Amino acid sequence: MVGPFKKILHAHNQRFPPSSSSSLDPVVDDSSRKQTRIILSYLLHLSLSLHITYSLCLLHFFFGSSNPFSPMEESNNSAVVDFPDNFMDQLLWEECWEEEATQHDQALSSPSGLKERVACAMGHLQEVMGERELLIQLWVPVETRSGRVLSTEEQPYSINTFSQSQSLALYRDASAGYSFAAEVGSEQLVGLPGRVFLRRMPEWTPDVRFFRKEEYPRIGYARRYQVRATLALPLFQGTSGNCVAVMEMVTTHRNLEYASQLSTICHALEAFDLRTSQTSIVPASLKVTSSSSSSSRTEVASILQGICSSHGLPLAVTWGHQDSSSCLSALISASYAADHGSRCFLAACSEHHLLGGEGIAGRAFATKKQCFATDVAIFSKWSYPLSHYAKMFDLHAALAVPILTRGNRTVQFVLELFFPRDCLDIQTHSLTLASQLKLRFQSSPHLMVDDNQIAEEVRDAATPPLTQEDPKGKQVSFSFSSASSLENRKRKTKAEKDITLDTLRQHFAGSLKDAAKNIGVCPTTLKRICRQNGISRWPSRKIKKVGHSLRKLQVVMDSVEGVQGSLHLASFYSSFPQLQSSSSSSFPFINPTQTVHVPPKSPPSSSGSQSSSGSSTCCSSEEQQLGGFQKPALSHPQLLTLSSMHEDQRPVRVTSSLPPLPSATTPRKAKDGMKVKAMFGDSMLRMSLLPHSRLTDLRREIAKRFGMDDVLRSNFSLKYLDDDQEWVLLTCDADLEECIQVYKSSSLKETIRILVHHPLSRPSFGS
């Protein structure tokens, strides 16, 4: 009996190999219990085999055979019974173990079976990855009262550490307290595991600190426990395509090689009947077809080489696509990188797909229009999957130009050009580059650039709406439908286009705040609409500025001996009833060429025409236009009288030693720039804003003064106090220009007051 039993045990071990040792307590307990059940089953089947042997012995006794297992001799009333040599093996295997085998097959697809395979896979991955500090944990959907959520509590995990630090263990404990949405429409947080589970696509980042809090709710714990790179993979059951769990891998250092390691990870998982996304994770090289021929790539590469060299561009990425796909992949052979950082970013581009609408390249591909962004590094990872790499390698402003085929005018390539880091005027530079590309592609027999386009600015889209609940109870809206967010942006753009110049003129008499309220938009949107129509300053503010300048001018004139009462400039503003009317079709402005001279102190003597000491001033303003509408010259009786005087009666221009008055169009301190007072929490500092400074320069200086690290720099926001005593958000260079102009042209102090806000800091409201 020992021989058959050994054969049975050996066959069972070959068919169902025991789980390898693991440090996972839940898995070890389940495995121990199952092994106990198997041993008891062995004993039961052994007793059954003994019972069968005893029965055969009884048969032998009655039939009189010397060997119960040998063929029986023929008799008149008996039949020959032949027991083969492997009779006992067949008996025990086919009948005794059939039910156990069926139960084990069912266990492979059960949660406990998944845990065992994942536990074995985790141990194997720790050896394959070779990371000195690595946490692998499993997120499994569970049913709760609030719905189906992803949880890692009481699920397998593995920690590999060679240091005394307990940071990964503490981060594991913190993660166990979180649950994420496992179905669309859930009120739970989405987070990284939720996005991977719902999208069924892997996601990774070189540094989790680049995430926003709404994208990665555990960002606070990640910073505290020095967590850096992370990779999350969806796990599928066999070939069914159903996502059954999410495996998350976390390290304490930055990792730029996850994409290259994905192939190894996938093979390691397949050894345990675990599979990840069926979609290609790393973009495969595009097939050379009619839509993406090698000759076209060579032509594009040559043009990019010339453009980047002549304009000093650090990077230019060529994106291509398959004929039947809207997914963009980087074409390395047709791209250009000038330095090491650009080459690293280009390598990251080769490891990512861009779907329609993602980044400015995806937006240009979807709309067939040129797009530019002042800073792609501040985009969310949902809006631009490469935003974290842009932060790492200091890439900001970029322009995307779709390259069309001459025949059917379909998009064949998208060129993404990154501007130099010291480029100030992004929009002008975009127009120049687009014009140069158009000229260079004119000689191409197959490719072209649309010559009837003006690049539109793309800002970071809000994270797509899918209702979530913040840990503090605040509702946050998210969605995994990029089409809905794109539709909202289109609707908003259409509403802005409906506001014409005539509509704006009807509200010129009031303040900007009242006009925005009456039109039905926010003040920031109204300012943007005004800039699109050529209005750099809301007229009522400009009139107040001119009136204030005239009053200051009157004070200077009155201080000059002999000119008191000769000309009252302070009454100009009150003398224009048209300024208070909103029904006027044209709005009066001061003519930029109109000049007011101060009359001499006394009539010229008979001995000659001698100029006396006086003051000569000129009231002029920068020429303004409203969308091509030229503002009419000022028609006022006093000015007409001055212009119609006889040449001998006209005021004489005199010189003065008084310092010139500050002009509204020049900075008060051209050398030192504007003074800035920045407040961050309970801290405050003063600094100078140099002329022509960009918002990125201001953010960088503020972050440096307050001692912020790279992650904090990318997450804080700035607001300035405007002339309506409201905090207005600074999001781009145009907002910064608006801020400077408000302080220059209003009665505010010369020091710009800026509020620095960070999601993890307590709000500060300066007085």
From Swiss-Prot:
Residues 673-759 form the PB1 domain. It holds the Pfam family GAF_NLP. InterPro entries: NLP (IPR045012), NLP1-9_GAF (IPR055081), PB1-like (IPR053793), PB1_dom (IPR000270), PB1_NLP (IPR034891), RWP-RK_dom (IPR003035). Residues 482-566 form the RWP-RK domain. GO terms for biological process: regulation of DNA-templated transcription. The keyword Nucleus applies. Probable transcription factor. This is Protein NLP3. The lineage of its organism: Eukaryota, Viridiplantae, Streptophyta, Embryophyta, Tracheophyta.
